[in-house]
């Protein structure tokens, strides 16, 4: 059996989200960390920053990685979870906006940098939670959305996309068994893998 390569990475959120420039946090290598998980939320958000800023930030990251001998292995976002129903929103226009305006650009960036990515970008609305049939339908939609994201990630740099396992029924998956089902149901559609993160 071949085991996967595992990195002990430091998520730069440990610094209370105050290190927003690569030059200021890549010296963390002095503590022995060479793998870093950068936060889309802290450094650059596709919905709130300009393309010029994001491009500049990524150029600075490349220079800092070479200077300090450390690498961003993955990018992550969590704060969107608390802002919107996101990918579980009942209006497809909201879902499309997040996929086209946030997820696809994030995948492209991760793919170009040979990094992986993850997020928690769906919260099921309360009225759907209270209706078992609507709850099931919402999950079916999520499986399709995530399968499509998995395909896009595969075609744009073989990016591993992780969905953070959360802690309440509106942020599925939230149990071990539910996580297994979530991942299996996504993969069963078209063979596009989505992974999970346990925080």
Provide a role label for each language-model segment:
Residues 67, 83-196:
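Active-site acidic/histidine proton-transfer and metal-coordination neighborhood
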Residues 1-115, 147, 188-197:
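N-terminal pre-domain/capping segments
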């Amino acid at each position: 059996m071949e085991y996967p390569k595992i990195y002990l990475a430091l998520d730069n959120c440990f610094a209370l989200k105050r290190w927003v420039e690569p030059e200021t946090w890549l010296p963390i290598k002095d503590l022995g960390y060479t793998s870093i998980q950068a936060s889309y939320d802290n450094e650059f958000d596709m919905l709130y920053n300009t393309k010029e800023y994001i491009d500049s930030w990524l150029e600075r990251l490349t220079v800092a990685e070479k200077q300090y001998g450390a690498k961003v292995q993955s990018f992550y976002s969590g704060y969107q979870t608390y802002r919107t129903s996101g990918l579980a929103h009942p209006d497809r226009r909201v879902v499309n906006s997040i996929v086209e305006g946030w997820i696809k650009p994030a995948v492209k960036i991760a793919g170009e940098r040979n990094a992986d990515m993850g997020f928690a970008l769906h919260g099921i609305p309360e009225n759907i939670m209270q209706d078992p049939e609507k709850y099931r339908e919402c999950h079916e939609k999520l499986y399709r959305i995530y399968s499509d994201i998995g395909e896009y990630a595969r075609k744009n740099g073989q990016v591993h996309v992780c969905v953070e396992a959360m802690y309440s029924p509106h942020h599925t998956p939230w149990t071990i068994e539910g996580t297994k089902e979530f991942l299996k149901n996504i993969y069963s559609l078209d063979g596009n893998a989505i992974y999970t993160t346990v925080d």
